[in-house]
C-alpha cells in the first residue's frame, strides 16, 4: 500500500528541493533583491493578504465551528505539535495520575456460580463484509448458526485510529470525555474489583500507551509478538486461543479474558493460512485496480478465518 506514496514523494521532491537549493545558494553568495522587485512583490503580497482575510471571514460564516488553531495551516501544525508534546507528558505520567482510581465494582452474582467472559477486540473488520449483517458472502458461517447471538447492526466507532478507539473500547472513556483517560483505568480493573481473575492476550506489539496500560492491569497478560526476537514474526490470531485454553485450565470460578487480535490488516493473505482460502483467487493482492477482486477475496478470507 505504501508503494502508492511514491508519486506524491516525487512531486514534493521536484517542487521543494530545487527551491531550497537555490535559496541556500543565494544566502551563501549574499545575493540581494532589487528595490523594484521588492516593491512589486510587496504589492502582490498585500493583495494575497487581503484575499486571505476575505477567505478567512468566509470560512467563519460558512462554518461556525471553524478554528484557526485546528483548521488554518500552518497554525494547526504548531498547535498539533504542542498538543503532541502535552499528551506525551500526560501519558508518561499516567501511572501516577490514575493510581487512586477505582470503579467501586462489586459482583452481583453468587460467588459459587462459575462465570467466564471473553471480550474480543478486532481490527479493520468492515461491517459491510460481515455475513451476519447481510453481506452476500459466507464470511461468518459459524456465527450465523450461533443460538442466542445478539448483533448490533447500527454501531459507529468513536475514532478511526487504533490508538484511540481501542482504549475507548477497553474503558468507559468516550470521544467527548477522552481527556479523562489520563485519570482512569480500564474494564479489566472493574472486573478485578468484582473478584474476577483477568487475562489480556494481544497479537500486537507494545504501543507504549493506553492499550498497554489497560492490558497490563490483568493478572495475566501476554503480547505474543513481543515473545519473539524476530521482528518479522507474524503469528495468526488463532495463536491467542492456545493462551485462552491455558487460562481456562486454571479453573478459576470467575474469569474475564480480553483478546486483542491483529484482525484484517493488510497484507490480507498473511491473516490466514493459504490452505484456508475460501474465496479465490486471492493472489496477487497489490493495491492496484486490476487486482480489486483478488483483494476483496483475500480480505473476505481474513474476515471468515
Which residue ranges define each predicted feature?
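A long, amphipathic alpha-helix that forms part
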Residues: 242-246, 283-305
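Active-site-proximal alpha/beta segments of enzymes that process anionic O-linked groups
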Residues: 52-119, 124-286
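Transmembrane and membrane-interface helices of multi-pass
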Residues: 1-75
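Short intrinsically disordered, low-complexity coil segments enriched in acidic
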Residues: 1-10, 279, 299-305
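A broad, structural surface signal
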Residues: 19-22, 189, 242, 304
